[in-house]
């Protein structure tokens, strides 16, 4: 079924499947919501797409501002899912599946949660001392980072990394240089008038060390 399918998928994705036999449309968004999915109802139809402008191209869809979403954006700099800036147009939350039946009934459900009740890693920590737990977690984090970076370096076009000088991007560069068989291209932005924000010196040291 669809749950078994999404459990095996890795990376960013958004897709729709039409089940001819069950007359059911299933829409899925990736775990952390990198790929967007928007939807609305208008003119007795269910309309969806990866961009809001695609939905607005349908003349039956009204163009009206969503006041609640605007308030959220002005307060928190984000319009939380399922809200969008347009009234009546919604976005499918990350890690969710939506099923739409032929009679118009629809339901969305979460298929992935970043904070499960008890994960496999939590089970592994049972009975370990603090030192042993730290050692296990550090090795597990490194292993997963290496796996994630290795998968994202599979590309048919040239790629690089944005290097800010912070711990996260520096770790990415370090692991990429270990995996790649070529020099890693790094890109950094510096500030001449905001010296407290400027990490150019740190980024340069990292780039020289690994390249």
Region locations from a protein language model:
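Cysteine-centered catalytic environments shared across enzyme families
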Residues: 1-211
């Amino acid at each position: 079924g669809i749950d078994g399918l999404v459990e095996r998928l890795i990376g960013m994705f958004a897709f729709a499947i039409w089940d001819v036999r069950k007359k059911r449309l299933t829409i899925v968004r990736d775990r952390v919501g990198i790929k967007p999915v928007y939807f609305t109802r208008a003119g007795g139809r269910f309309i969806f797409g990866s961009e809001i402008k695609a939905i607005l191209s349908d003349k039956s869809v009204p163009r009206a501002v969503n006041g609640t979403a605007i308030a959220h954006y002005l307060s928190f700099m984000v319009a939380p899912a399922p809200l969008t800036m347009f009234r009546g147009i919604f976005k499918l939350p990350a890690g969710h599946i939506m099923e739409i039946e032929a009679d118009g009934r629809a339901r969305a459900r979460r298929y992935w949660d970043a904070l499960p009740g008890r994960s496999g890693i939590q089970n592994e920590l049972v009975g370990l001392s603090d030192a042993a737990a730290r050692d296990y977690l550090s090795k597990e984090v490194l292993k997963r980072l290496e796996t994630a970076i290795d998968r994202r370096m599979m590309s048919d076009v040239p790629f690089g990394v944005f290097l800010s000088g912070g711990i996260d991007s520096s770790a990415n560069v370090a692991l990429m240089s270990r995996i790649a068989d070529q020099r890693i291209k790094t890109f950094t932005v510096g500030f001449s008038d905001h010296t407290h924000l400027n990490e150019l010196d740190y980024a340069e040291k990292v780039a020289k060390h690994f390249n």
